[in-house]
């Protein structure tokens, strides 16, 4: 009996040990709070570098890529460089990719509606063709695609192209000027340009004063030379005024440009500075009266006048005259005086009241008024 009791206890003990062994592996201690549960390893892991898609770099390149192509002959096209030299007489053909392309080219071609220039638009590209080119055609040619939403269009800055083209012509180192003498106004608040542009990028160009005769250095501080614009006065002042000309040298030949009169402007930029004055503010019946509106401004800024007067609603006949002239006010300072005068003959009671003058330029407008009474 004791034997069977001992045997049963022994079997029960072994069964309990087997169950405990399944839940508590040997040599494993309980983890403390905060202990890292990731098994340490001596292997060095290589950091993973995220792959950059090639498409991204391709897209950024495409965005800045010019849409302009130049015809090279035999059906070949290539993207033009920033500057291109052609011989006068050659045909220029440019194409810009896009279904709605706009163009910009030297104003000389647009001013005279030159028949040598044609611009066409096809389904996939715009085309500009210039035949029988001359030195006067030298300048910037650019294009851009239009983005339109209904009737509202804007320039797509990601799809543009431009090139500056020199048309070299024998005996013409300078881009021809329509006159033999030109005026350049020196404004203290903006750059001034003496437009000595050349037809060959290799030409050496210098600036000269007529009297006293001397070369004016383009030192990069006050004056710089830009072959696409000419001599640029960065900060014009009264000492720069006078008559100047340019001299170009290339291929053992030299040429003198037209002369330029540099005039210093003393009137600051802004809306018109306007005054109004009546010949008399009290007028008897049957007399004549005039009201003068005067503007002092920059020499190269045009002014437009508009009048409101008492007899206007009754269609009272009046005479209006607009004039302008340049005046020199000491130390070479130059001002443009623009005037408008309204003349009323045989003054009547309907002519009494306010005479209102509005003067307008590109920078704004000014309105002034005066009263005229019947006496």
Curated annotation (Swiss-Prot):
Annotated SUPFAM superfamilies: Immunoglobulin
**Entry-listed glycosylation sites:** 219
Which Cys pairs are S-S linked?
Answer: 96-143, 293-357
Looking at the record, which segments are called Disordered? Answer: 20-63
- Bias category Basic residues: which stretches? 40-50
Say which species the protein is native to.
Mus musculus (Mouse)
In this entry, which stretches build a coiled coil?
Answer: none
Subunit arrangement?
A: Forms a complex composed of PDGFRL, TNK2 and GRB2.
Residue ranges constituting the Ig-like C2-type domain according to the UniProt record = 47-159, 272-375
Protein name in the entry: Platelet-derived growth factor receptor-like protein
UniProt entry keywords in alphabetical sequence: Disulfide bond, Glycoprotein, Immunoglobulin domain, Repeat, Secreted, Signal
Q: Where is it located?
A: Secreted
Q: SMART domains per the record?
A: IG
Query: Would you name any one GO CC term?
Result: extracellular region
Q: Which residues form the signal peptide?
A: 1-21
Source organism phylogeny = Eukaryota, Metazoa, Chordata, Craniata, Vertebrata
């Amino acid at each position: 009996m004791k034997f069977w009791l001992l045997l049963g206890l022994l079997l029960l003990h072994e069964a309990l040990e087997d169950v405990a062994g399944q839940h508590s592996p040997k040599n494993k201690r309980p983890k403390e709070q905060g202990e890292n549960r990731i098994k340490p390893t001596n292997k060095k892991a290589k950091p993973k570098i995220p792959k950059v898609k090639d498409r991204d770099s391709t897209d950024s390149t495409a965005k800045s890529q010019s849409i302009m192509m130049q015809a090279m002959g035999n059906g070949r096209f290539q993207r033009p460089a920033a500057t291109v030299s052609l011989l006068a007489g050659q045909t220029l053909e440019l194409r810009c990719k896009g279904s709605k392309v706009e163009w910009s080219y030297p104003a000389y071609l647009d001013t005279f509606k030159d028949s040598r220039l044609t611009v066409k638009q096809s389904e996939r590209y715009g085309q500009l063709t210039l035949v029988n080119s001359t030195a006067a055609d030298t300048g910037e040619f650019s294009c851009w695609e239009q983005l339109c939403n209904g009737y509202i269009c804007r320039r797509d800055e990601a799809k543009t192209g431009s090139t500056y083209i020199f048309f070299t012509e024998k005996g013409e180192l300078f881009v021809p000027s329509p006159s033999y003498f030109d005026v350049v106004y020196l404004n203290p608040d903006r750059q001034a340009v003496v437009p000595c542009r050349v037809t060959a990028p290799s030409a050496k160009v210098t600036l000269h004063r007529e009297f006293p005769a001397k070369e004016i250095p383009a030192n990069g501080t006050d004056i710089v030379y830009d072959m696409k614009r000419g001599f640029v006065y960065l900060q014009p002042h009264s000492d720069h005024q006078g008559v100047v000309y340019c001299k170009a040298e290339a291929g053992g030949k030299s040429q003198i440009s037209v002369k330029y009169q540099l005039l210093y402007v003393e009137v600051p930029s802004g809306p018109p500075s306007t005054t109004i004055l009546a010949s008399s503010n009290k007028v008897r019946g049957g007399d004549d009266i005039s009201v003068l509106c005067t503007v002092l401004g920059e020499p190269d800024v045009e002014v437009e006048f508009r009048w409101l007067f008492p007899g206007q609603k009754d269609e009272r006949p009046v005479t209006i005259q607009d004039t302008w002239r340049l005046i020199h006010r000491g130390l070479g300072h130059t001002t443009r005086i623009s005037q408008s005068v309204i003349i009323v003959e045989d003054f009547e009671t309907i002519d009494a009241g306010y005479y209102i003058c509005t003067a307008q330029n590109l920078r704004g407008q000014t309105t002034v008024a005066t009263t005229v009474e019947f006496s």
